[in-house]
Amino acid sequence: MEEYELREIALQEGGSNLDINTPPNYDNPVGDGSSPPDSPDIQKSENQFKNVERELEIDSKQYLAGHDAENNHDENDEDFKLRRYFENSQRMALGNGQKPKKMGVSIRNLTVVGRGADQSVIADMSTPFISFFNLFKPSTWKEKGSTFDILHDITLFNRDGGMLLVLGRPGSGCSTLLRLISNQRGSYVEVKGDIKYGGIPAKEWKRYQGESIYTPEEDTHHPTLTVRQTLDFALKCKTIHNRLPDEKKRTYRQKIFDLLLGMFGIVHQADTIVGNEFIRGLSGGERKRLTITEAMVSSASITCYDCSTRGLDAASALDYAKSIRIMSDTLDKTTIASFYQASDSIYNLFDNVAIIEKGRLIYFGPGNKAKQYFIDLGFDCEPRKSTPDFLTGVTNPQERIIRQGFEGRVPETSADFEAAWRNSSMYRDMLEEQKEYERKIEIEQPAVDFIQEVKAEKSRTTPKRSIYTTSYITQVKALIVRNSQIIWGDKFSLISRYLSVFTQSFVYGSIFFQMEKTIPGLFTRGGAIFSAILFNAFLSEAELPLTMYGRRILQKQRSYAMYRPSALHIAQIVTDIPLTMIQVFLFSIVVYFMFGLQYNAGKFFIFCFTLVGATLATTNLFRVFGNFSPSLYISQNVMNVILIFMITYCGYTIPKPKMHPWFAWFYWANPFSYAFKALMANEFGDLSFDCHDTAIPFDPKNPTRYDNDYRVCASPGAVEGILSVEGKDYLDQYLHFRSDDLTQNVFITYLWWVLFTAMNMFAMEYFDWTGGGYSHKVYKKGKAPKMNDAEEEKKQNQIVANATSKMKDTLKMRGGIFTWQNINYTVPVKGGKRLLLDNVEGWIKPGQMTALMGSSGAGKTTLLDVLAKRKTMGEVQGKCFLNGKPLEIDFERITGYVEQMDVHNPGLTVREALRFSAKLRQEPSVSLEEKFDYVEHVLEMMEMKHLGDALIGTLETGVGISVEERKRLTIGVELVAKPHILFLDEPTSGLDAQSSYNIVKFIRKLADAGMPLVCTIHQPSSVLFEHFDRILLLAKGGKTVYFGDIGERSKTLTSYFERYGVRPCTESENPAEYILEATGAGVHGKSDVNWPETWKQSPELQEIERELAALEAAGPSSTEDHGKPREFATSVWYQTIEVYKRLNLIWWRDPFYTYGSFIQSALAGLIIGFTFWSLQGSSSDMNQRVFFIFEALILGILLIFVVLPQFIMQKEYFKRDFASKFYSWFPFAISIVVVELPFITVSGTIFFFCSFWTAGLNTEYNDINFYFWFIFILFLYFCVSFGQAVAAICFNMFLAHTLIPLLIVFLFLFCGVMVIPSSIPTFWRGWVYHLNPCRYFMEGIVTNVLKHTDVKCTSEDFTHFTNPEAVNGVTCKQYFPISEPLTGYVEAINEGDESKCGYCLYNNGEEYYNTLGWSFDNRWRNLALIICFWIFNTLMVITFVYITRKPRR
């Protein structure tokens, strides 16, 4: 097989005469201080080295300074400079003793087995029941589902420094092959066969993980980082140790940074944030270039690029491929790339090509022989059809052309193609060449030099067997900087968090303002300290979604061997420390002194230090559940149960002696308990609490009646005759811990933080919930297609063939003439405004397809956003008309817009998503049957019939359809709406040639039927380009280069450019690539002609302006009047029904969310029920009953955090739907509130049955039982709607988690439990207390539970005092008669002994709640008020959904 046969022809440039593949003959490692045998003259070598260094420096400056200059050099000159730069870099490296890491790949008999689609079905709420009952069905025990071969018996190889192009249609197995070459095997059932890397077996190759990397199709980056920050981080993690002499790390990183940004033309975007589908940032093409650049930073020996030209224009894609070619030639980098669409220019840069169909290898060999091989098999290639399109097209019955005389003899199925290949002489030659290559590997042993060089690249402190280049501490430092940048990148949320904390601290401080050192202040002071811990715990809830977010980025960078996952957690906790310290200090500096805690600097700093430890421990605990859990909802619900445990067993709500033994162990396994004990000891250890005015006995009418020697404080720790209680005695007797253990408890609090840190590090190292990047499909039960079945393959081919033939030429579309004039679009930037569209004008007419082209970043997507009325930011100037009239309210509805980002609701199947679009966007006069028939037609045309019942899913979880299939679904969603005008933003990006052809052919039919449409397209083949009638070509800055007809065989278009001095376009050349080259598109493209200015002076523009003036003067066209324009196709009532049905289906299919709340309620109910097991009628049990209800209140409040992520996610999908006018804001808002109700009802009922009777609250009054259940359910309705209202306001999860604690502080602090109503400051009691729904919940349910409860104090509950008048026959009751305002009763402790008396605080439950100012008579009023609060929250949801209904773009 010829090696690198097409290199010089493809690149058309010269190279260096230096043989860079021959390393210097050094026997000793570089840097050991010795010289090799027969070493040359040292001085002479140093002089030569310095000469090369100076030459490299000159070349570097020329390249790095000149890559972005305009109108100076032609394209080949730019390639020459890049080649020369790399060659000189390699010469210097060789002179420094470095050796190229030349590693090829040899694959033999590779078979990859995947799970069949029938192995798992779409999970829903019935799944657990079915699984349970299947345990009792022996017939199901052995049913494990089918498997299939994703790849079947693949044998090929790629030499070191070689470039292998892998071609195949989507689903053929190209991505799997690339993953296996990069040694990513985790997601597959079985991998059979042999892969060797330069002779190193795959098992051993794991030690060199970062030396073979896989760059996935999707672009995964932190959206708030800039390009500079993203690449700088990668460079810090991959900076090699054996750099050039005296070259500093910073210099090395800057050199590589400048080089790569110059190579890929993103120099001007260096300080632009990356962005994503929800955050504005880089364009799609620029983001793709960043992905490629990041992969190159890894400096891997073998790089696998999966569809890496997706989103790039043809010129940029060619520049990228040329850069890869040069790097492969000069640096001996081995490249394997998979492209769905590639031009001949790109194709010719590769040495070999492998073609895969349905997992089978049907060709492997030189690229220049592949076309002839298939022609010899009996296939023919159309004129102007690119070689890659032809090679993939031969496997498609609808695309391939059979040569005359070969009918019935050509292969039909993938198995036929594989058999033909294996029977060919080329296959036998390939096997011989592979054997020869493997023998060469055995002789030359490149692995020896490779291993030595890998070791030399590692930093001195990096273990030699480590897969990482830099040391652990270096990784941590880089991650600390990146984490800080991510946090500061969202500075609005950070500042909002601190402002929220500071604001809330005043609320907390005012509630417990200047607590008195009296007996009532004992419990209140403990409540203040407890609330300080609880406040920071609620803030830590934000860590759960943040832990889940970024898993895919971690998985990618982990595969690049950038850093250990545990290093990421170390960096997180390092950045946590200052942020937490600031947070706690802002909180403490206010509350400590407002609380009236001891004015002692040491105690203040102990308070802060302990709170910091408790907050850090809680934050890490939340991360533990996030890292050990596959789902946010699982971790959220489990964490809520644990949080209830921690709150209950910290020692505040239940003192340690009152804890039942079955759960008392959690007191010792609870970070909160140690923090609480430390803070209590810090405050109470040397305090005394006075009780002169409240000591027992006490006569309100005659305060001096009783002798103080016989009075006692009504508090644990009291001593008769001493009218004060020592804080340390209170801690000892009531809470059962010593104040001397302060230091120990602080230390243990931090020890928990360390333990949780270790658990997180373990989880991040050994758990990967992303599925390794492999997307696994799940189907409805019984709907999974058969895999690797020849008959099924023929059936699918026939479906597509029938769909193609059924495309009706008589389709009737309601199109119109859409014109736009003088469109300018500016956006605010730092220091002024930036013009993104500059005076763009044009039109689209029925029956015409207009192509919108230009280099990446030229403003194509921006123009479509403006024309489709999707822009909500910036300033738009200019005029748009439809049929001569200004755009009306129904424009967005009748317009189809296929956006670049594929945003779909993951809980639906493909067919359900399409039907939903058809039902809500097609005219209501069209029957449902006709709408569904059209959906099936589109499914067939999009080659998605077999995916109709597949779950859309998400890429993050690895469950759902692939990236390419999502793109097809995006197009289908718009097509089924039968729009009047169609805008398509890169509809063929990421699709193979045949899929692209089918889509373009389909929209060509729509155009022929009368639909006007405009389509941005990056890499059109000649065949695709011929389907378009007109073209609008943009240059950077949104300037028009050309707008007009393309003409037959593109003659009108090409003649325009030839008129101004561009070379003629050849017959075999792709006109789309020709015009991009002519106008200087691409990374390094340049042109001597100022095309925007040329266009302004051209006669074509004058003709365009005359035509636009004529269209405007003609006025509204006499089209059929269809009545008053409607913003939405269907009524609000119909929309509401359909949206509710969809949301209900999504909730039904999310058992993690629904069953998670059920399980949370059950566990919480059992925990709370058994914690307050069988409460009796003692005085202390009155308190326990109230705290039982308080725990139920906390459960409801915690539900707020559970609904946040679901609502925010669904709101993003709603914004996308609303922009296309699927449905109004009201149906979504009311549906998402109502859909929760049945699930909340079940959750509340579960809690009721698990806790009510367990805690001993059963009474013979059924109305009391019913009331408890009813008001609790309504309270849960309120809590969920409250969380939804907050989520409707906030635009991201972090902000919502910042705002929630500020609001819930008013809920639980002002409910009347932690601070009794009479003690609440007048300012708050006057309005917040009365506006707090939790107050009405507590009043209603407490009075309901305690109404018929009599109190009988135990010996421990009594306040003991001596009756000195007992010797005179005075009984206890006579000695201390109870009179208002006192409550309770007095009796002798021991029957017959009236000298020892006891005072019980209450006679019955009514006396208890009367002291709070509550009344049983208000219970139905309270219930009604909770309903009112719930309705108010619902109105807030509706209001804020309306206000935030439009996405920021």
UniProtKB/Swiss-Prot annotation:
One CC-aspect GO term: membrane
Binding site for ATP: G854, S855, S856, G857, A858, G859, K860, T861
GO biological process: aggregation involved in sorocarp development; hyperosmotic response; sorocarp morphogenesis
Keyword terms, alphabetized: ATP-binding, Membrane, Nucleotide-binding, Repeat, Transmembrane, Transmembrane helix, Transport
Biased composition (Polar residues): 14-25
Domain ABC transmembrane type-2: 488-731, 1152-1386
Biased amino acid composition, Basic and acidic residues: 1-10
TM region(s), chain numbering: 519-539, 577-597, 602-622, 634-654, 747-767, 1155-1175, 1188-1208, 1228-1248, 1266-1286, 1296-1316, 1423-1443
Pfam families with a match to the protein in the record: ABC2_membrane, ABC2_membrane_7, ABC_tran, ABC_trans_N, PDR_CDR
Annotated spans, Disordered: 1-49
Primary location class: membrane
Record-level Gene Ontology MF annotations: ABC-type transporter activity; ATP binding; ATP hydrolysis activity; ATPase-coupled transmembrane transporter activity
Protein's cellular compartments: Membrane
Superkingdom per UniProt: Eukaryota
Boundaries of every ABC transporter domain copy: 130-383, 818-1062
Lipid bilayer topology: Multi-pass membrane protein
Family according to the record: Belongs to the ABC transporter superfamily. ABCG family. PDR (TC 3.A.1.205) subfamily.
Name recorded for this polypeptide: ABC transporter G family member 21
Organism: Dictyostelium discoideum
Gene that encodes the chain: abcG21
